[in-house]
């Protein structure tokens, strides 16, 4: 299949800063790519790197792709490229080939349909505000708390306060972004192992400490995130929860097939994509919720500005860029 390859860059400012123990995000940049087949079928993809170093690498590699290229040659060329480029190209090819068919509408706009990221600076007051706004009708909510941003003594005190304030209708995900050592991680695991509000501890130890993560997973559900990106073979080996970010994996079609085949213990998470990448997030999240271990995705819905970049129609986004 002969293809026309096109790309356009984008940049936007998040409506609120997102901070974790490793970095923080104020703005997001990337590219929308468009593939047109010789029979006029169109596929869109999004190159959505999270870090500046990766952004520079992707810029150089995207410039190496010619405007006119055969599908086999394109697939061969991107094998050595950054995973975000591979993800975008494979996403667009999947759309052209009919491997994924997006719905006109997905239903993740309501607050309870996605995990809510707590403000780590004012975590207790933020929790109280959320409860006032959303819990008076008894709906289930899932909260995510980024930890390892303050000293552990202070965060343990906050944990105790949080646990005293949440009822059975609130689930909690605690994400250390790989910044704890084994002592602190085991301490939190011991505190939380019998707590029914906890969905999981997310990447509590550094990406390389697979033995430590495996031992922790025997005490309490552990969800791998960054470890999966560094060691993709863990996707087939890890027996616990997996935080999957399709725009960061080299081929989201693999994730699509896993969810279609009802693979358990997968949770879908954003890397702050535009509406192009969001189509994949919403489609995969819908499949996940129909699977054996349904969990609301982490889509950071309240962090995006009001912009055409987040429309549900790929063509409109492309035309306005």
Where are these regions (language model features)?
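Shared catalytic-loop signature of beta/alpha-barrel
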Residues: 71, 206-209, 215-221, 226-321
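Glycine-centered loop/turn motif at secondary-structure junctions
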Residues: 138-139, 196, 238, 263
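Alpha-helix boundary/interfacial micro-motifs
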Residues: 56-58, 63-65, 156, 163, ...
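General beta-strand structural signal in soluble alpha/beta enzymes
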Residues: 7, 45, 172-175, 202, ...
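N-terminal capping/lid subdomain adjacent to the active-site entrance of alpha/beta enzymes
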Residues: 1-172, 177-179, 183, 190-194, ...
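Glycine/proline-rich, positively charged
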Residues: 149-172, 176-242, 247-248, 252
